[in-house]
From Swiss-Prot:
HAMAP family: HisB. It is found in: Cytoplasm. Its EC number is 4.2.1.19. GO terms for biological process: L-histidine biosynthetic process. GO terms for cellular component: cytoplasm. It holds the Pfam family IGPD. Belongs to the imidazoleglycerol-phosphate dehydratase family. Pathway: Amino-acid biosynthesis; L-histidine biosynthesis; L-histidine from 5-phospho-alpha-D-ribose 1-diphosphate: step 6/9. Transmembrane segments: none annotated. It comes from Nitrobacter winogradskyi (strain ATCC 25391 / DSM 10237 / CIP 104748 / NCIMB 11846 / Nb-255). This is Imidazoleglycerol-phosphate dehydratase.
Length: 197
């Protein structure tokens, strides 16, 4: 089983994250931010990655530190769980509809952290959650997971739908990219013989 646990404690947040890449999509998420919990639940369910997140953050300030630090810890956990990356499919691309919204998510588990994020939100907030934090989370995740990640919303009108299509798109892309390719189960998917540089 490809699993990992990460603990991250700063003056701003105290976070514990665990993942099982070969799970069934079970989630136990408690960040204190309702909308964010909803997105992480979706991520687990649609990636089929078991995800546990417990976060105690300075929510009296705002949601920024908790959202970003969960992205950091979750990215680190995924990277650790991938290990040598032998046998993974590595690449995946997904078009994800959510009612009137359509987003595209493309991932390369390359070891080279890059985020291209072309997503606009018609509103500044979804409930109490600042929409600008969606990008902050994706950036923290991509950098710490060591993945190249392109996220683009082609069109959409509802901020909740836009965010949800991005998280679900990432989930389905991760599900495909971390899957073991049975035709190359003992190979690192790179002509270099290694990933990450």
């Amino acid at each position: 089983m490809r699993t990992a646990s990460i603990k991250r404690k700063t003056k701003e947040t105290d976070i514990e994250v665990a993942v099982n890449l070969d799970g069934s999509g079970v989630s136990e998420v408690a960040t204190g931010i309702g909308f964010f919990d909803h997105m992480l639940d979706l991520l687990a369910r649609h990636s089929r990655i078991d995800i546990t997140v417990r976060a105690d953050g300075d929510l009296h300030v705002d949601h920024h530190h908790t959202t970003e630090d969960v992205g950091i810890a979750l990215g680190q956990a995924v990277k650790q769980a991938l290990g040598s990356m032998v046998g993974i499919s590595r690449y995946a691309s997904v078009y994800m509809p959510m009612d009137e919204t359509l987003s595209r998510v493309v991932i390369d588990i390359s070891g080279r952290p890059v985020l291209v994020f072309k997503v606009g939100f018609p509103r500044d907030k979804i409930g109490e959650f600042d929409t600008e934090l969606v990008r902050e989370w994706f950036n923290a995740f991509a950098v710490n997971a060591g993945v190249t990640l392109h996220v683009e919303t082609l069109y959409g009108e509802n901020s909740h739908h836009i965010a949800e299509s991005c998280f679900k798109g990432l989930a389905r892309a991760l599900r495909a990219a971390v899957a073991i390719d049975p035709r190359a189960a003992n190979e690192v998917p790179s002509t270099k013989g290694q990933l990450g540089g």
